[in-house]
């Protein structure tokens, strides 16, 4: 069987992504675990998630025929592979799942010794935050949300909806579940969606921001959350702080969380078209809504795009809208861990040529390849991300180490 190393300390469990702080393990430990298990994750909170009998699939979830357990950073097995689903450890605990006789996956919580502290009887269970986690029972229109602590105490919250805790607060809702329209006829992970009003609670279950918003997002690390108020035609978005104070009015068709001092927002412009731009933390539109695509400032500069006849071209700009790259590119792949982006330009004959641009606008691989793709992989031995590029040119394959190159 092919062995796999997971390239991210994240997994999708019960419909929610859980992440843990990655901790380096020695190359020797990594080799021993790779030889013994079929899938090995980076260490998180001092323990390494392993899988026996499964294999990695493109969306990073596992086939259900594998079993999950945990080893320590010395390679010693701590929790034998006995679970049908599992998340990384975080805050001393991990969510694990086991299939019931009726085929449902039921989740519970274990501590670092493998002791079950919350029984495996919930259709969904979030990770531990502030000493508590959110449990859910019921999967259709009737659902109950509960608050569980690490001592195993569980109590009903009394809301129709509750998210996991994020930066000290959780979203709660009062309303109802309606069946999603399934035009494509595909199997949906959750066939129902919640519609109602939203507010926020503290880890003790007490209300902090009253239920009042027509839509809401989790609080980010900067202490702000996007909230939406129904307008005449659509929900309009803005930002509040943890006291509930409106710091950016609900004036936008969409609003992403702040990265640095800029947030991507959009407005409806002439002809019903969406235009994207950027605001600062006061809500001022510092880069006007004029683009057909805009990405957040994960690094010093970012990419914006314009569409014409179904084709997008992209420009690299700075935080005040200044042009960083003096030409436009196509076929943008900007998911690199260090800000690198693969893209294309066209020669005089219209042939696409691919290269790689650093976030500072420097071309670090010339535009002369038939295709280029960027890959990121966690390097446990050096406790860092390793970034590579694979390119083709005239039928030949090339590989490049581009980790932090050009920055």
Please identify what each model-predicted range represents.
Residues 25-407:
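Residue-level detector of conserved, function-critical positions
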């Amino acid at each position: 069987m092919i062995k796999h190393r997971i390239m991210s300390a994240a997994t999708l469990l019960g419909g929610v992504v859980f992440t843990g702080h990655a901790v380096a393990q020695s190359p020797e430990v990594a080799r021993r675990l790779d030889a013994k298990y079929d899938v090995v994750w980076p260490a998180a909170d001092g323990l390494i998630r392993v899988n026996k009998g499964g294999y990695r699939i493109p969306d990073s979830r596992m086939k259900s025929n594998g079993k999950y357990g945990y080893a320590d950073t010395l390679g010693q097995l701590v929790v034998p592979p006995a679970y049908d689903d599992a998340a990384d450890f975080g805050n001393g605990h991990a969510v694990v799942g086991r299939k019931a006789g009726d085929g449902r996956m039921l989740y519970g919580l274990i501590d670092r010794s493998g002791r079950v502290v919350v029984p495996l009887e919930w259709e969904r269970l979030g990770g531990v935050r502030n000493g508590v986690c959110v449990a859910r029972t019921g999967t259709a229109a009737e659902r109950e949300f509960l608050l569980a602590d690490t001592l195993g105490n569980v109590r009903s919250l009394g809301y129709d909806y509750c998210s996991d805790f994020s930066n000290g607060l959780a979203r709660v809702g009062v309303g109802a579940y309606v069946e999603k329209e399934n035009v494509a006829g595909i199997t949906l992970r959750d066939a129902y969606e919640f519609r109602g009003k939203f507010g926020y609670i503290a880890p003790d279950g007490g209300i902090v921001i009253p239920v009042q918003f027509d839509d809401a997002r989790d609080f980010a690390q900067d202490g702000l959350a996007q909230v939406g108020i129904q307008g005449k035609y659509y929900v309009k978005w803005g930002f509040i702080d943890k006291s509930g104070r409106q710091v950016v009015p609900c004036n936008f068709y969409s609003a992403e969380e702040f990265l640095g001092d800029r947030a991507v927002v959009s407005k409806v412009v002439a002809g019903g078209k969406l235009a994207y731009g950027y605001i600062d933390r006061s809500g001022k539109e510092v880069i006007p809504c004029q683009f057909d695509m805009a990405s957040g400032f994960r690094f010093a500069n970012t990419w914006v795009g314009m569409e014409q006849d179904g084709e997008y071209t992209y420009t690299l700009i700075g935080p005040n809208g200044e042009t960083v790259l003096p030409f436009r590119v196509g076929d943008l792949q900007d998911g690199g861990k260090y800000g690198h982006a693969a893209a294309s330009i066209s020669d005089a004959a219209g042939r696409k040529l691919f290269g790689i641009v650093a976030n500072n606008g420097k071309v670090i691989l010339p535009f002369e390849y038939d295709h280029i793709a960027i890959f990121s992989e966690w390097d446990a031995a050096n406790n860092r991300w390793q970034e590579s590029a694979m390119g083709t040119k005239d039928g030949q394959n090339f590989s490049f180490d581009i980790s932090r190159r050009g920055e």
